[in-house]
Structure formats: structure tokens, C-alpha cells
Amino acid sequence: MKKSIVAIVIIIVGGVGYWLISPLFIDKKVNESIEEIMMKQEGNKPQPSMVTSQEISSGTFAGLAGHNAEGTAKLIRTGDKYYIRFEDDFSVTNGPDLFVYLGKDGRYDPDARIESLKGNMGSQNYEIPGSIAVSNYNEVWVWCRAFSVAFGKAELN
């Protein structure tokens, strides 16, 4: 009985440890195109695009709290929807439970969660939910929910 309990504890601790530490050694590269935003807006119709995208603002990521982050983030409007786009030069230290948030003037807003980070490298598109007032924010954050720590931030100008 005692050996079973010890084995179960070791398995649980090992699993949690792997979940927390493995992202530091694993990179996930994403390669989404800007055209995918237009396709989504048009409902995946195969005809030539009639919807145009407009870059509203952009900024460069900087790492925070000892983490590395670099690359370009853009706020893009397509039709009546807004998107955050990370360009191909984007990279951030990988970690557990990373999410994309919006923030303002040096503070991320926990109520402005966009989506979980698709990968720690490469071009990515994130649709901003209609419930979020884009005009209230001027920053994009990569935030680790598990440890409540910022990995990177881009100020949008």
C-alpha cells in the first residue's frame, strides 16, 4: 500500500514538473499568413478578396521579468473585426499557460484576454473578441497565467 502511494505521488509530481519545465526546452513555431484573416472574414469563400485590412498600430516586443521577447505586433482592422498579428520575427521564451492579453500604460488587463498563445515563435493571428473595446488599450502582452508573470509586452503606436 505504501509503495503504491509513493508511486502515485512520484507520477503526479513528475507530470506537474514536466508540464512546468518542458516548455523551456520546446519551441513551437507558427506560420499563419495575413490572408488567413481575410479568408476568415469572408467565410472561406474561394473568390478574390474584397475585404481589405488596415494596420491601425504596431510595436516591438520587449522581454519582461527575465524572459526574452522580440518581434513585431500589429493591430489590424478587417471589416468590422480587429486582430492582433505577430509577424514572422516574433519570438518569446516558452512557458506554461501563456496567453495573449491587451493592456494599457504598463499594466495588462486580466479582463482583456484574447487567446492562448499558439506558439512561441513565428507569425500568428488573434481575433479580438467584440466584447473588448480596442480603443481602451495600447499594449499587447504575453502573460503566464500559471505564475501570474509577464513574459513580454509590445507598446502599440
Regions found by a protein language model. Name each.
Residues 129-155:
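Short, exposed beta-strand-loop hairpins at the edges of beta-sheets
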Residues 107-114:
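Surface-exposed loop/edge segments in extracytoplasmic proteins
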Residues 90-94:
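A short beta-turn/strand-edge loop motif at beta-sheet boundaries
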Residues 116-122:
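Short proline/glycine- and polar residue-rich coil/turn motifs
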Residues 85-87, 123-131:
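Exposed aromatic-hydrophobic patches
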Residues 21-79:
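Transition segment at domain starts
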